[in-house]
Design a protein with these regions (language model features):
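Short cytosolic juxtamembrane segments of multi-pass membrane proteins
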Residues: 186-188
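Mg2+-dependent prenyl diphosphate-binding active-site environment of isoprenoid biosynthetic enzymes
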Residues: 1-165, 174-184
């Protein structure tokens, strides 16, 4: 796990380095991109979500609390990735940007729900991390809250809602649809 933390730190600094290089975008957009990534990875995002997760080991959480926690974890980074894409497209309207943000929020939450499901269903070799670790550590999960089948169904519903949101974009949203399919089908 220590190696994973160091790799994550290194990749994060590379992301900031990449965003700080000249791109041809207006400086205001690049600054907005840097701010978006900083918020998504800091205490208002991934780090904050992890802190909530660790603070609630052994405690019951309701669905609203779980959604808040999960929206701050990988969900925040997925939303940031989509936001960075929108910031690089000056032709998008505010309504389109909001739609894409809603897509990303649903996708990010579905990713976390699937992560909880995989922790119960997959084996350690497939997962690439210790299977059952969340359960063993008595962490709050969607599987613990609603059961395995209901958690999987909830994730599939979130994905369907996310894909429906981007339908108006047609072929321009092909990669976003493929990303949603990947999240649903992933095994690790």
């Amino acid at each position: 796990e220590a190696t994973a933390f160091w790799v994550g730190d290194a990749l994060q600094t590379q992301a900031f380095d990449g965003l700080s290089r000249p791109t041809g975008l207006p400086a205001e957009r690049q600054l907005a991109m840097l701010s978006t990534l900083a918020q998504a990875s800091g205490s208002l995002g991934m780090a904050g979500g992890q802190a909530i997760d660790l603070a609630n080991v052994g405690k019951a959480m309701n669905q609203a609390e779980l959604e808040q926690m999960h929206s701050l974890k990988t969900g925040a980074l997925i939303r940031a990735a989509v936001a960075l894409g929108t910031l690089s497209c000056p032709d998008l309207t505010p309504a389109q940007i909001q739609t894409l943000d809603h897509y990303a929020a649903k996708l990010g939450l579905a990713f976390q729900v699937i992560d909880d499901v995989l922790d119960c269903e997959a084996d350690t070799a497939t997962l690439g991390k210790t299977a059952g670790k969340d359960s063993d550590n008595d962490k709050p999960t969607y599987v613990k809250l609603m059961g395995l089948h209901a958690a999987r169904t909830y994730a599939e519903t979130l994905i369907a809602e996310a894909v429906a949101l981007i339908e108006p974009f047609g072929d321009k949203a092909l990669r976003l649809r493929q990303l949603a399919e990947f999240v649903t089908a992933r095994k690790n």
